[in-house]
Amino acid sequence: MNKKVSAVLIAVALTAAGHVSAAELNAYSIMPEKYASRIFAEFTKDTGIKVNFLRFSSGEALARLTAERGNPQVDVMLGGPAATYAAGMKDGICEAYRPKDSDAIPSNLRDPGNYWTGIGVIPLCFLTNTKFLAKNNMKAPSKWADLLDPRYKNNLQMADARTSGTATERIYSLVKVMGEDEAFKFQKKLNGNIQMYTKSGAGGAMPIATGQCASGIFYIVDALDIAQQGYPVTITYPEDGVSFGIEATGVIKGGKNNAEAKQFVDWAASKKFAEFIVANKINYVPTRTDVKTSNPILDLSKIHTVQVDTAWKGEKRKEYTQRWINEVIK
């Protein structure tokens, strides 16, 4: 079926669903569909509430919610960086709601006004094809500057800041590590090695896995998924520092199934949900302090992380995206 036609039909179904049954929920997911479908299926299994959802990148989801705020088409949003929610809060997109049993989630991983709740932590990382490294007698990148190596020319893929929260997270990282002006100068140099900017954050991961390009910058959840499938890749973190995203969820203001939306957010903030993502290798670091992951690559204490305030990210998103357009890719 034509993708555009399919999307229209699903959107119609989402609209209709709110009028058909109180036991249904309409959602946008920024989280990749392969994870969202499993999560929503588990929620339905636990509650009996059917979920109709569409998947978009963070920029696309934010644009749709902003356009639809007078007549919301969904009740809840799953996933995506908390900065996306922060950017939309001032436009009245989200409804304040603190989920039940959320005390086990540290306050820095929840919005102080309860407009979003963190359900996972995801640092950025480098994902690199090991066959490319061996062929070129190279080591995997361990610092941001390593990506400027001329052997990477036309061999890097990473996300487009106009559509992807992964890309804006990359900008925030660089600004915190290098300073604002130096970060944009670095990205201009880096642009010379870029093969393609992808619409979604995970878009370049499979081309790296299959050797169509060499390396890129991704959230760990996307990079680790590729590694766990057995592709010839290695994952490394920038020693000079990297920020992390807070994967969030929140109730959409004015949604037709408000009670069900709150029930979903309660469930997503629960210990049961955190245990579910760990058991099913949905590779977010749980935000709850009472659930741990045993995968050493997800041990945040071993990574040089730079904490970036979520509210600041929301304030800077448009400014930095426009600056990236003007100074980096033009």
Residue spans for each PLM region:
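Sec/Tat signal peptide C-region and signal peptidase I cleavage site
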Residues: A16-A22
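Extracellular/periplasmic bilobal clamshell ligand-binding domains
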Residues: S294-K330
